[in-house]
């Protein structure tokens, strides 16, 4: 038996998405740009996400010489990960990043974060400030 109510719900969700998708993608791009404006100035910054061909709500980046797991553990006020949710139990570097040709060290230095429907510019400012504080502290150690 087909779940008619779920089919109708999916149809309505698709209609809503198509009506606001362009505006939402622009909003996410603006949030990502705000984040990058702050963190890209830090020493050793690199971005794994393609600069143009990507979903603007997900950003994969890191800092050369800074272990992603160390950054993850230090970032107590923000949500970042060293890989996808389905691989969150694994300690090793992301197999996806390795598959893209990144070295083991580069992949191990990478973290990912995302911007969602309810993420505000203030959330992004706060998150980027925390990343800046952590990286500056780790570099000084």
Q: What are the roles of these predicted feature ranges?
A:
Residues 1, 5-23, 37-43, 118-121:
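Amphipathic alpha-helix from the class-I
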Residues 4, 53, 105-107:
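A generic structural micro-feature
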Residues 5-15, 36, 72, 94-97, ...:
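Predominant activation on well-ordered alpha-helical scaffold segments within soluble catalytic domains
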Residues 13-16, 37-38, 45, 71, ...:
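Localized chelating/binding microdomains
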Residues 14, 35, 63-65, 86, ...:
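Glycine-rich beta-alpha junction loops
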Residues 59-111:
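Conserved C-terminal alpha-helix-loop-beta "cap" of PLP-dependent enzymes
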Residues 93-141:
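PLP-dependent enzyme catalytic core of the Aspartate aminotransferase-like
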């Amino acid at each position: 038996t087909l779940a008619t109510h779920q089919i109708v719900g999916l149809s309505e969700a698709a209609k809503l998405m198509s009506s606001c998708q362009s505006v939402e993608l622009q909003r996410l791009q603006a949030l990502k740009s705000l984040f990058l404006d702050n963190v890209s100035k830090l020493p050793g910054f690199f971005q794994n996400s393609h600069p143009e061909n990507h979903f603007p709500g997900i950003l994969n980046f890191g800092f050369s010489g800074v272990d992603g797991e160390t950054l993850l553990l230090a970032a107590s006020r923000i949500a970042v990960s060293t890989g996808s949710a389905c691989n969150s139990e694994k300690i090793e570097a992301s197999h996806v990043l390795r598959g893209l040709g990144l070295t083991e060290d580069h992949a191990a230095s990478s973290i990912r974060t995302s911007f969602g429907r309810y993420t505000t510019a203030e959330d992004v400012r706060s998150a980027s400030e925390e990343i800046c504080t952590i990286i500056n502290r780790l570099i000084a150690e």
